[in-house]
Amino acid sequence: MRPSGRKIDQMRKVSFERNFSKHAEGSCLVKFGDTHVLCTASLEEKTPPWLRNTGKGWVTAEYGMLPRATGERMKREAAAGKQGGRTQEIQRLIGRSLRAVVDLQALGERQITLDCDVIQADGGTRTASITGGWIALYDCLKWMESRNMIKVDRVLKDHVAAISCGIFASQPVIDLDYLEDSSAETDANFVMTGTGGIVEIQGTAEGTPFSEGEFTSLMQLARNGIGELVALQKQAVEG
């Protein structure tokens, strides 16, 4: 039995609140249960130096957690003067995941930055950031389309979403909360497109190595879960 009482294939309640910020070109407050992340997409009419005069744009991401997003207050990374390794790893993952479904040539020489700020953490912050980040990116592109800058369907090739799965109490489970994640025997994150393409898989055995059969079970849970998330994304943006 999972601590939350959920079934092994049951995700937490997921919701998207679009246009949460009045300033950003695109924004979304995403909730995976008690994990809440504010995702904003900001457009800049510039590209990184290595892309200048190529006609291509760029999509990148930054990630952070508010000091009291967790049970005890954390020091702001800005106060320490540098980002931690975990932060850098997660924001690179978010950027890679979103770029996987963007035609950078069709975007033109512009940069969109996704800022994913964790307001409250209860496991799965990176997967929530990717899934909510897609909504914010979509709304940013719609903002651009309304100003005749691009066509959304030429720039955005597909949906992308992410979910965590793991072995908890010797059972494969989906969408681990913090209590499960902190004591899971295996922890994995899956990023996939709406058409089923695999963008990234991160999997680690915390103690006992996991078998190929267990991995296959996690993969199937993830496929089903991401299918549900993509359906929720479509419902959110199509009204």
Swiss-Prot record:
Residues noted as binding phosphate in the record, renumbered to the chain: R86, G124, T125, R126
GO molecular function: 3'-5'-RNA exonuclease activity; tRNA binding; tRNA nucleotidyltransferase activity
Gene3D superfamilies, per the entry: GHMP Kinase, N-terminal domain
UniProt KW keywords: Nucleotidyltransferase, RNA-binding, rRNA processing, Transferase, tRNA processing, tRNA-binding
Reaction(s) the record says it catalyses: tRNA(n+1) + phosphate = tRNA(n) + a ribonucleoside 5'-diphosphate
Enzyme class: transferase
Function: Phosphorolytic 3'-5' exoribonuclease that plays an important role in tRNA 3'-end maturation. Removes nucleotide residues following the 3'-CCA terminus of tRNAs; can also add nucleotides to the ends of RNA molecules by using nucleoside diphosphates as substrates, but this may not be physiologically important. Probably plays a role in initiation of 16S rRNA degradation (leading to ribosome degradation) during starvation.
Protein name, per record: Ribonuclease PH
Source species: Rhizobium johnstonii (strain DSM 114642 / LMG 32736 / 3841) (Rhizobium leguminosarum bv. viciae)
Lineage of origin: Bacteria, Pseudomonadati, Pseudomonadota, Alphaproteobacteria, Hyphomicrobiales
